[in-house]
């Protein structure tokens, strides 16, 4: 009979190698932040820490980065049936804690960071999200019916093995991470599925 100790070691090894695979997928990418001041060359520490993490953040494990306190201008349109625009929530707020430019890249581990040490170029989205795909809204069967141009997330295939609801939504909400995988740059820009011939767009939009 296999001992509990061996089973435990096997489980630990599985977690270790899974973590290693994730780390390898971001090495050398735009999310490899090992050159940020104060990291000591560590890739993950800007966002995650094994000790003394921010316990107020539940959307990502062992969170280590200061979160944005900005107020955002959200997307709105006469054709958008997702309800009044909400401020970014869930994992999207964590993404924006670097990408809105209000929080220093090296503001992690309880430190305030270096003023002006912010993300730049096309990655700097800012606080005006009115010209970006809407986020942090409920995408459910009722919205699909009301809109008439959206796939039913409870039934439509995500292209990732399950339904849109199961694979791409977070507590039923559309977020940045619905389309982007922060840890995998295989399909730029960190897309979860290919958008060749607008395939990703057409996952949700019936056009």
What do the predicted segments below correspond to?
Residues 1-9:
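Bacterial N-terminal signal peptides that target proteins for export
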Residues 9-15, 19-45, 49-207:
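C-type cytochrome heme-c attachment and multiheme electron-transfer modules
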């Amino acid at each position: 009979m296999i001992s509990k100790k061996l089973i435990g070691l096997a489980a630990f090894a599985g977690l270790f190698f899974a973590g290693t695979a994730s780390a390898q997928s971001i090495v050398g990418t735009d999310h490899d932040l090992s050159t940020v001041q104060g990291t000591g060359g560590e890739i993950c520490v800007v966002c995650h820490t094994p000790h003394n993490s921010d316990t107020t953040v539940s959307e990502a494990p062992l969170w280590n980065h200061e979160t944005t306190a900005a107020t955002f201008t959200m997307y709105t349109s006469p054709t958008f049936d997702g309800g009044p625009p909400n401020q970014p929530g869930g994992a999207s707020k964590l993404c924006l804690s670097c990408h809105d430019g209000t929080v220093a890249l090296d503001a992690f581990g309880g430190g305030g960071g270096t003023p002006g040490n912010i993300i730049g170029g096309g990655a700097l989205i800012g606080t005006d999200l009115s010209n970006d795909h809407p986020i942090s809204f409920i995408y459910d069967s009722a919205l699909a019916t009301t809109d008439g141009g959206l796939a039913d997330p409870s039934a439509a295939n995500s292209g990732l093995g399950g339904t849109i609801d199961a694979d791409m939504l977070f507590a039923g909400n559309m977020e940045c991470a619905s389309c982007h995988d922060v840890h995998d740059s295989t399909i730029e820009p960190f897309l979860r599925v290919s958008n060749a011939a607008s395939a990703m767009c057409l996952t949700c939009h019936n056009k």
